UniProtKB/Swiss-Prot annotation:
One of its GO terms (molecular function) is peptidyl-prolyl cis-trans isomerase activity. This is Parvulin-like PPIase. InterPro entries: PPIase_dom_sf (IPR046357), PPIase_PpiC (IPR000297), PrsA_foldase (IPR050245). It holds the Pfam family Rotamase_3. It comes from Rickettsia typhi (strain ATCC VR-144 / Wilmington). PANTHER family: PEPTIDYL-PROLYL CIS-TRANS ISOMERASE HP_0175-RELATED, PEPTIDYLPROLYL ISOMERASE. The lineage of its organism: Bacteria, Pseudomonadati, Pseudomonadota, Alphaproteobacteria, Rickettsiales. The gene is plp. It catalyses: [protein]-peptidylproline (omega=180) = [protein]-peptidylproline (omega=0). Belongs to the PpiC/parvulin rotamase family. It comes from the Bacteria. Keywords: Cell outer membrane, Isomerase, Membrane, Rotamase, Signal. Its EC number is 5.2.1.8.
């Protein structure tokens, strides 16, 4: 029995040593060092949630992302030390903000738990089927645009394009949409009349274009657009797994709306403001 215990102890020690060897130090600073395991413990849950994929090892991240995570982690530690050295947390203003933050966090947790406990498999399946039926037979287009402030600027860009100007270069030079300008003005794929995408004026003009066709200037609340359609293809039908986030968000919005409405009804909420069309002189 003693011999067996020694074997188990040896194996345990070797496993610990192997684990320590694998847990590399990825950064040092005056306050200490940072190991891979610390980074993974801090960021893995939220990164998995954002990417939808299971990230197992620190090395799974691209090198530039590894550096970003290390800097974020160390900066948080350094700021935590600065906070500890200050008297900021004892001020009345901070305590009030802290209480507000706690209340908001508690409300968010309450709503998240309520939504989670009220989404059934049947609700998910029904909403998924409705979502899929709405996508069947629809077309999606890949669009790019150049956004400018005035119609005069839009006409100038359109003239340059008509004379053989390169759309990508003109987008980079003229577009006010900095999120897309450096990528040739590419917005991505859109579906006609799909909630939460682009404004109707833009969509209607875009879906009337042929592939590689460039629009005349289009006015929206954002300014003037020159639109180009890069590709057209049928909308792919997502699996339940692929559509899960979308369906969960749809159901969450519906459940939340009803929950708040029920709370208002129970509280017998009465708004005492005058009607909008009953103002004096209207």
């Amino acid at each position: 029995m003693k011999k067996l215990s020694v074997i188990f102890l040896s194996v345990s020690m070797l496993s610990s040593i192997a684990f320590c060897d694998q847990d590399k130090v990825v950064a040092t600073y005056k306050g200490g060092e940072v190991k891979e395991s610390q980074i993974m413990q801090e960021f893995k849950p939220q990164l998995n949630l954002q990417s939808g994929e299971t990230i197992k090892n620190f090395d799974d991240f691209p090198l530039q992302d590894q550096e970003k995570l290390i800097k974020i982690y160390v900066n948080n530690l350094l700021l935590k030390e600065e906070v500890a050295k200050s008297s900021i947390t004892s001020s009345k203003e901070f305590q009030e903000k802290l209480e507000n933050a706690k209340n908001q966090l508690a409300q968010q947790e309450l709503l998240a738990n309520y939504i989670k406990s009220n989404i059934t498999d049947k609700m998910f399946d029904d909403e998924y089927n409705k979502y899929v039926d709405n996508l069947k037979g629809k077309e999606q287009i890949k669009v790019a645009h150049i956004l400018v402030k005035s119609q005069k600027e839009a006409n100038t860009v359109k003239t340059k394009l008509s004379k053989g100007g390169n759309f990508n270069k003109l987008a980079e030079e003229f577009s006010l949409d900095k999120a897309t300008a450096s990528n040739g003005g590419v917005i991505g794929y859109i579906i006609l009349n799909q909630s939460g995408q682009l404004v109707p004026e833009f969509e209607n003009k875009a879906f009337a274009l042929k592939v590689n066709e460039v629009s005349t200037p289009v006015k929206t609340d954002f300014g003037w657009h020159i639109i180009k359609v890069l590709e057209k293809k049928p909308v792919p039908i997502p699996t339940k797994k692929e559509a899960k986030v979308t369906i969960d968000n749809i159901l969450a919005a519906e459940i939340l709306k009803k929950y708040i409405s029920d709370l208002e009804a129970k509280a017998d909420l009465k708004i005492m403001l005058p009607k909008a069309n009953s103002k004096t002189g209207s």
